[in-house]
């Protein structure tokens, strides 16, 4: 186990952790945002990032510092912390971003790691190759080999107390991402950035981003702190945390502000289009859109950048509380409704339900069924997987609430879509206490039918009758042929007809009583 990263709480694959950074003498609570600081541009000073926004860690570019005579001399003379006036942890990039943008840089892993150590970096980065999406597999494999060599060079370097990143690349090839994650995890390096996802996010390919991160996570150990390089828009943070990412960096707060763009948890707005500011941060409570538009360009940029940071840090606090409360999935689902591409990302997340289920706590807060995607949550998959723990004997009635006929049954179990069947003794256990709407969708019934099928498969000697409340044909088609089907509404109509014919003479056909 890595002794510098401690997991304190979790929900889905998301976690609250403590990252110890020995060279800085600080411990950073994760999930954490690393504001990007350009040493040439002072949009918001690092001292203010720390004192006003609560930043515990930031990231800057050691290659920019190294290639600027003035910055290099100052950093070597007084150290990075004094130069930036920041007491928290400082991560530095190696120039890999410049390599991706311009095709080459004038440094090596050995040189840049030594320079990062000399200027007082707390978490350093080797020179990896950020392979963009959709390249030929041969290029992705060749780039990955160069990155592997960079990790080997980083392992061999004398880094002292400085933590070192082990980037995970692999383009849009899940098997290469997983392989890269496994290789990085086997090194003695410390933090694991998933790289080259910015082009996916810029193109709103959140589903591809999810697949890349999920593949990398399969290769990495649970105790590996994961950094999603270049991610920092508040709209996608809950999704990324649910995947198991712990650290985020982005210059978006400043770059977007420079273009008059205003970040929200639902997307990006242009200041020129706003009549109201839908936020309660200090900037939005003091200024109106007209006030901001009347400011000079530099002042407007600074105020927008401050808002953008406030909303991003607030979202991380909201995510942490959701993890603590056990309702991170509800927050992810809410954010998924902000943009069709985010919904694609959410559905991609649910496609990795078996992977999520392995890390998701077995018991937590209330389960709210909010959409057809809720039918595919880890809790449903876990209930189906655990059908092998349930023993059914004799003739078992599986019912949504009523007794279908006068038949005698050896046992009566409840059926609740999307989970399916379970003994009534489990009715008050999580997640079977789920809040489910009266009008369910097809996915919920089809998942319940899968649960019935699993129970029948695990108990071949038992006989089953399913009393359903008008399930759709697509769901009933998934129920094994050996299960007798009865519609509760049809039985209710039949009993009503019999009661009408019999008048006051009584009803010998039974009644639809509660299964609870």
From Swiss-Prot:
Positions that bind Zn(2+): 279, 281, 284
Enzyme Commission number(s) of this protein: 2.4.2.48
Listed GO CC annotations: cytoplasm
Top EC class of this enzyme: transferase
Active-site residues annotated for this sequence: 93
Region (Disordered): 488-516
GO MF annotation, one: zinc ion binding
Catalysed reactions listed for this entry: guanosine(15) in tRNA + 7-cyano-7-deazaguanine = 7-cyano-7-carbaguanosine(15) in tRNA + guanine
Compositional bias (Low complexity): 488-502
InterPro entries linked: ArchSynthase1/Queuine_TRR, TGT-like_sf, TgtA, tRNA_ribo_trans-like
Pathway it works in: tRNA modification; archaeosine-tRNA biosynthesis
Cofactor binding notes: Binds 1 zinc ion per subunit.
Record's function text: Exchanges the guanine residue with 7-cyano-7-deazaguanine (preQ0) at position 15 in the dihydrouridine loop (D-loop) of archaeal tRNAs.
Similarity remark: Belongs to the archaeosine tRNA-ribosyltransferase family.
UniProt name for this protein: tRNA-guanine(15) transglycosylase
Gene: tgtA
């Amino acid at each position: 186990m890595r002794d510098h990263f401690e997991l304190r709480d979790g929900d889905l694959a998301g976690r609250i952790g403590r990252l110890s950074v020995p060279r800085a003498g600080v411990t950073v609570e994760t999930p954490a945002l690393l504001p990007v600081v350009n040493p040439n541009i002072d949009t918001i000073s690092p001292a203010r990032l720390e004192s006003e926004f609560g930043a515990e860690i930031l990231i800057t570019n050691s290659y920019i510092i190294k290639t600027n005579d003035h910055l290099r001399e100052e950093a070597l003379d007084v150290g990075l912390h004094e130069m930036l006036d920041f007491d928290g942890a400082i991560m530095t990039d190696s120039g890999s971003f410049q390599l991706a943008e311009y095709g080459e840089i004038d440094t090596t892993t050995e040189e840049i790691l030594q320079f990062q150590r000399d200027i007082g970096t707390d978490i350093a980065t080797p020179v990896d190759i950020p392979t963009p999406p959709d390249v030929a597999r041969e290029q992705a494999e060749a780039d990955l080999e160069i990155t592997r060599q960079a990790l080997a060079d980083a392992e061999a370097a004398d880094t002292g107390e400085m933590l070192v990143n082990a980037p995970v690349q692999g383009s849009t090839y899940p098997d290469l991402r997983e392989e890269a994650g496994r290789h990085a995890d086997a090194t003695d390096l410390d933090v694991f950035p998933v790289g080259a996802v910015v082009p996916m996010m810029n193109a709103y390919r959140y589903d591809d981003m999810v697949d890349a991160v999920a593949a990398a996570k399969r290769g990495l150990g649970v105790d590996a702190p994961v950094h999603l390089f270049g991610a920092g828009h508040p709209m996608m943070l809950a999704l990324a945390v649910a995947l198991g990412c712990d650290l985020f960096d982005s210059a978006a707060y400043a770059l977007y502000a420079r273009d008059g763009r205003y970040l929200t948890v639902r997307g990006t707005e242009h200041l020129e289009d706003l009549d109201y500011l839908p936020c309660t941060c200090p900037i939005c409570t003091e200024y109106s859109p007209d006030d901001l538009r009347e400011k000079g360009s530099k002042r407007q940029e600074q105020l927008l950048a401050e808002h953008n940071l406030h909303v991003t840090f607030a979202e991380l606090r909201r995510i942490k509380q959701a993890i603590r409360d056990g309702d991170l999935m509800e927050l992810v689902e809410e954010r998924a409704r902000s943009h069709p591409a985010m919904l694609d990302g959410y559905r991609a997340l649910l496609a990795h339900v078996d992977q999520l289920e392995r890390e998701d706590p077995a018991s937590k807060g209330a389960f709210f069924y909010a959409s057809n995607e809720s039918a595919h949550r880890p809790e449903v998959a876990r209930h189906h997987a655990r059908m092998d723990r349930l023993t059914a004997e004799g003739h078992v009635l599986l019912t949504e609430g009523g007794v279908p006929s006068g038949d005698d049954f050896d046992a009566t179990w409840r059926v609740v879509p999307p989970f399916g069947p379970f003994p009534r003794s489990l009715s008050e256990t999580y997640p079977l206490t789920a809040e489910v709407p009266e009008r369910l969708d097809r996915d919920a019934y089809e998942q319940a039918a899968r649960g019935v099928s699993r129970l029948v498969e695990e108990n071949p000697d038992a006989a089953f009758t399913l009393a359903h409340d008008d399930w759709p044909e697509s769901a009933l088609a998934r129920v094994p042929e050996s299960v007798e089907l009865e519609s509760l509404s049809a039985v209710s109509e039949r009993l009503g007809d019999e009661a009408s014919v019999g008048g006051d003479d009584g009803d010998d056909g039974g009644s639809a009583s509660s299964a609870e």
